Amino acid sequence: MGVIEFLFALAQDMILAAIPAVGFAMVFNVPVRALRWCALLGAIGHGSRMILMTSGLNIEWSTFMASMLVGTIGIQWSRWYLAHPKVFTVAAVIPMFPGISAYTAMISAVKISQLGYSEPLMITLLTNFLTASSIVGALSIGLSIPGLWLYRKRPRV
């Protein structure tokens, strides 16, 4: 993949990630003045995850580092705009949730219950379930670490 193709793919990924970020921000009753920042932060998070995955990191670690970036930027923006960090960060990480792997794991579980046990279905179920669980864990831990680190009252050393 050339540089131009990568930049177009990155721009497309970021634009398409901003749409659900704004949608979920509207569901969560985020103030109108913060919607554009939720979209931008969702695009930054998903774009940084794509860059990390393209550079060779797996999806779990890429998601963890992207959610740490989203958490850090959200804390900084909350100081600038006098809002709670969750106003920006929660809607911004929603596009990174593992919908496909969770859906595939669920469909495999339904097929196992209907057709009976088979090893390929069980491998598909466990692989996708563990991937989805790892990504959700990476999102939650990565989003909470910047708050624990930046709001710490005691010295770090």
Curated annotation (Swiss-Prot):
Keywords assigned by UniProt?
Answer: Cell inner membrane, Cell membrane, Membrane, Transmembrane, Transmembrane helix, Transport
One GO BP annotation of this record: succinate transport
Tell me where it mainly resides.
membrane
Localization recorded for this chain is: Cell inner membrane
Segments traversing the membrane: 8-28, 50-70, 87-107, 129-149
InterPro entries with a match to the protein in the record: ThrE_2, ThrE_Dicarb/AminoAcid_Exp, YjjB
One Pfam match: ThrE_2
Provide the topology term for how it sits in the membrane. Multi-pass membrane protein
What cellular component GO annotations does this protein have? Answer: plasma membrane
Q: Which family does it belong to?
A: Belongs to the ThrE exporter (TC 2.A.79) family.
Its biological purpose is as follows:
Involved in succinate export with YjjP. Both proteins are required for export.
Its assembly, as annotated, is: The transporter is composed of YjjB and YjjP.
Q: What is this protein called?
A: Probable succinate transporter subunit YjjB
